[in-house]
């Protein structure tokens, strides 16, 4: 979610406790007395009865339809920089130098392979904080996670991360698959709907992006009517986890449970995404592949084991007393890089050149919409992309117009922020049909707008794709990004550590003004967009393999598309898993179990009694 909806700014951000609605399932306790007896209860007695604290599990929170923000409190406690440190201290690093040609060479015990993935928005936030370029920020993070002066310098086992992956690489895969998905949906637009029994049905138009977990959580809990429109593609974070775990499991002959994947993301809601049951090895596991089996594991293994944010990355460094600014802003030495076990995958994951596609026109959230439009524009020479701003800067309509006919070729839109998302879901809400036979279609209160128009999506039915993000301003404004006050404190501490002076405590006392916050976001955006000319790969571990093809310049769009589809086919063939199981996911309507007993019957009386005791009611 956005910084505006973070825990520090919302007074309805509740930790699991008596305020959570889950106690409705167990409270009030049934009296042991005879139910036929009458009892007079005074108000004083009711007020004195304190409800027991709720025992909320992560599954409860994700299956709850009461709120969105309280789930983050659970996830923050379960996925944090402390979990990273505890895991590194609990398990020694499994050195993969002894693995050759997919044969395990004496790896025993509880050792783990540690892999990290970093989003470009995190690098932009770090770069703006420390006054370095986006490329240097990437090197700083890599040195911290994998270098000799970073995490490996401390801890019980001196464990660090064997590989650090740029999620931009996997994002390119999602961009290409998004274009394919929209093309398939448009082809089905006038035909019969896909069978509901299909595991991954083609979404209805307009397709809504599904990479933002805050938006997905909101849709599943409150607007299930939009679920058929959601893109079935995994997000770059989720797809990176699947990609890493399936390939390393296959090539190194280790179960997914021994591969620990950390994702560093710009928002807290990515923790929600990593905790989804649909994003575990159970979704792609096949019965005839014992190599993927996780012995003695009762629970499915997550594709992403832990998610931390930009701010938590600073906390991770602080916990180990590591000054990030003192780390080398250069690639890792070759002596500290480990060859990836598959040369072809290594060439793809760690390219010598990579076009970041982080321009102003592509936006701050991955460029899904921009890639779709430019791909179709390349198929229609001389066509033009027209943009029209909506009610605010976070709503923009795009139309690709034919040069010959002047007619629209494809229409798309961008909706950022929950205020705009609410307007969007209202447009997609189907019209209420009368239960009376032969009744005429209802007419909207607004003159001239029929129910058929509302059912068609209120003006968005002819859109092919809509990029939806919960954060106003997009992903660079994620709630986990480094705030302007944190950046001031970090800069003060960094300066004092360099010149030896004592840090002052004045900076934290000054609350930033809205103008300062906007200026800070603009600075982060500027760094993010500058990465297009400052593109870099992580320290390539594939150089020592000697099998990679040299690429002197970035691939052209058509060649990039062919390269992506080729690597996807190679991935599926290598693992023996159908490609849809690897790249697609599913969404479901979250139904509240409030007021329902275990046998499914409603228990309205108990709910009403509890509501009265806590001062509420229906």
Curated annotation (Swiss-Prot):
Keywords: 4Fe-4S, Iron, Iron-sulfur, Metal-binding. Residues 495-516, 530-560 are annotated as: Disordered. GO terms for molecular function: 4 iron, 4 sulfur cluster binding; iron-sulfur cluster binding; metal ion binding. [4Fe-4S] cluster 1 binds at residues 20, 61, 64, 67. Pfam families: Fe_hyd_lg_C (PF02906). [4Fe-4S] cluster 2 binds at residues 212, 267, 471, 475. Component of the cytosolic Fe/S protein assembly machinery. Required for maturation of extramitochondrial Fe/S proteins. May play a role in the transfer of pre-assembled Fe/S clusters to target apoproteins. Belongs to the NARF family. This is Cytosolic Fe-S cluster assembly factor NAR1.
